[in-house]
Amino acid sequence: MQSKIQKDSPLLTQEEMYLFNCGEFYYSYRKFGAHFLEHKGRWGTYFAVWAPQARQVSVVGDFNGWCGMNHSLQKWEEQGIWTLFIPGLPTGEIYKYEILTSSGESVLKADPYAFFSEVRPHTASVIYSLEDYSWGDQAWLAQRKTRNPKVLPLSSYEIHLGSWRRTEDGRFLNYAQLVTVLIPYVKSLGYTHIEILPLMEHPYDGSWGYQITGFYACTSRYGTPHDLMYLIDQCHQAGIGVILDWVPGHFCMDAHGLGKFDGSPLYEREVHEQWGTYKFDYSRSEVRSFLISNAVFWLDVFHVDGLRVDGVSSMLYLDYGKAKGAWQPNRYGGRENLEAVGFIKQLNATLHGLYPDALLIAEEATDWQGVTGPLDQEGLGFTFKWNMGWMNDTLRYIGLDFPERRSFHQLLTFPMMYAYAESYILPLSHDEVVHGKKSLLDKMPGDYGQKFAGLRGLTTYFMTSPGKKLLFMGGEIPQFIEWREDRELDWFLMDYEMHRKYHGFVQQLNGLYLREKALWEIDGDWTGFEWIDVHNHEQGVIVFCRKGKSFQDRLVVLINFQPYNYERYRIGVEMAKGYREILNTDSTDFGGWGMTNPGLLKVEGVPWHGREFSLEIRVPALGAMILKPELA
């Protein structure tokens, strides 16, 4: 940012070049790229780019007729960095780097550090100043410093901005327009955070933002960087945190992007055959400076509250997505990518040092040990990890026909064997409602009513199981069709009673989650969870207790995964004056058939489930209920 650039020198210093070449210049975006600033009494734009193998680098754009003869950059030979100050060149101008490679080929490249880009399909960078936004989220940031996310509720609404809602003629809502509709909607549903699919500039809509060309440029599809600042600022002022998906594992192969930037493999190590992208080369210090600075950039400049790091498994393993014999083991003969491991640890150490209150979330799908373990204990240092095992087992189970479920009861119970091995987030994400996997509602067996009942049960299981929560947009309506990135959600479904009632159910359940300490106060170890009935595969019922620090905060959760009513179902409980049903998914308010348990439920001295006391309740088909003790 301009003020910080001018603090010492407006231009790159020798010390900063040294840090960059060592992989430790964590604010490289303040000097690399295009910066409108004052130098020697004149305003203009300063350019800096890393291209060590280039024979010549020029800046070209409309301002010089796309001819770089008069605007060649000076090379700092030892550092491989090229710089140039062009007096009088203002913000808003489009530009690219014209790079003459060692083989004599001339290529046009977008600026790796550009803050803004043309709207696709155009690919030029835009000179843009990130100054002059007045933030109003000071109270939010101050409060964030005092909070421990591991012992507080965290419920994220995952969203793809381009397909959440559109204008009547099918155009994207821009960042500023989303403020008036997205924030009240998320707030009304009771979510604590939104998690946004990648906003970094990308050429192809169908990549959902995961194949990036401009890591420092929020996509111009939805407006300007200042518009995005406004959206995040307003989220914070409304009490909503913002997490961004971040993709340091690979980048797209489009000609204007990072690939073969100076004619040589500069940012990339190899092709990711499975995804058709380039993998980053973590052995290069300058690539580490680029990527770690990028993470810092989003936390620093845009005030985001956390980063969800995409594709960590693909980074950690040398054989990821490769056939047998198509990869080389590391120096110890193993499959671990030691350079990627080193990068991740350096990344998390840096971010924890600069922003100790930021959330660092790993999408990691293997049994790698210590993903959320402390760095000083050989862990990777993430705050949370997506629990892909829980997600896979749960969605496999609920997709089974009712009779089959009896033989696969362990899919419900086995995830608790490792529920506290890491600090987990339970993800019902975008990846699970595309590519023929069906929507959450359509995964359910049974008729129309049973599908809704089953989904209410699943959602209750999701919200009451140990771990933080993430639900992809559309799951709260709920949609029958899969997510499609080229159109908005099926909002018309809210005209139908069952969808409207399910939407209200999600709202009520989120509110209960926020209120009930047992669901998050002891979310990180076994003292916060206890099985009551774990083996009832025949009836398809599980019963467990979630615990807070106080007995009066305890909750008893029962979920019936079979389409049968049980009129007198006995469960073992701790002694209390009685238990009150604080949620029943079969309530007619939620679209159920009304088989509930009103009033105070009497505790009896009948031993059951290894406890001295028990009570009887009515259990509805495919129903779930939450009971809370009342003291004498």
From Swiss-Prot:
This entry's Enzyme Commission designation comes to 2.4.1.18
Q: Which domain of life is it from?
A: Bacteria
Task: Tell me which Pfam families the record gives.
Answer: Alpha-amylase (PF00128), Alpha-amylase_C (PF02806), CBM_48 (PF02922)
Q: Which GO terms describe its biological process?
A: glycogen biosynthetic process
General function of this protein? Catalyzes the formation of the alpha-1,6-glucosidic linkages in glycogen by scission of a 1,4-alpha-linked oligosaccharide from growing alpha-1,4-glucan chains and the subsequent attachment of the oligosaccharide to the alpha-1,6 position.
Query: What do we know about how this protein assembles, alone or with others?
Result: Monomer.
Q: What is this protein called?
A: 1,4-alpha-glucan branching enzyme GlgB
Q: Which organism is it from?
A: Desulfitobacterium hafniense (strain Y51)
- Gene name as annotated: glgB
